């Protein structure tokens, strides 16, 4: 069988590539990062929760190879796009990575190939943004010459109960033939594939999942603030409420949202809603509450020091953990970053300790350059 291509070998693309390879499908991965390609070729991982042994086994079996050369797209029968979809400086969707990748594919697209977008995005992206670039750049027609579908990534780094293969895979094709072609590739690999009527449904499914979580976290964060003022233990309240066997789902307060999905995805939905002259006030309010939590943490640190007759300015503060969740090395959108920046802005002397992140890597989020103590 033809190779399966994966463009973008990060926290989404690499697990997807390994899942196909371990199912017996040959995979050719593409990434612009020479260091990643070299490590994969040597059987080494660069993501903590993916051990070297998985990479080495896939490479040794001939099931996984990686390259920086887009001209090798001619070797694959299907290609999944797994590139970042961040927000720009104005908190608007940034599809530049997706569109740049689409142009690279379009210049090399051949009849019979399948293109699948896996990057999280707003409803309409596959049909309204990706499709015109692919058809215009290749001269081919979707559904006749090539196939196009959307299947949202649902990665949860560090989850010990679910992995890429066992998480149900939602899949929507631009045409019926597109869906059938995508199912032929995905059904032998994943435990369960959930076909839907089109890419818009699949796109909104992912956005809704993460908006649901973000809104509920905002609710419990607001409850946390109220409980602080009332002198009530919010954790005891949640634990007691969680004894109800129906109609309640526990969410827990925290210093803010982290990861690439939950802090970002609701803004993709509100952006699209504005096209329909609708203001998603509930979602936007949740975003305001969650984005304000790091400031609350800084204020609480200052209050704690004041209770011991110490000012925040000049005090040494140690931040324990800077990843966005436990036991991973991923600090994308981590609330630890604005917490550290807020403490520094008020004159604190800040260090951090994280066994999985020895030094803060360059990110779009911050210019901080600290090393773990």
Where are the model-predicted features located?
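Structural/interface elements that position substrates and couple domains in central-metabolism enzymes
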Residues: 1-373
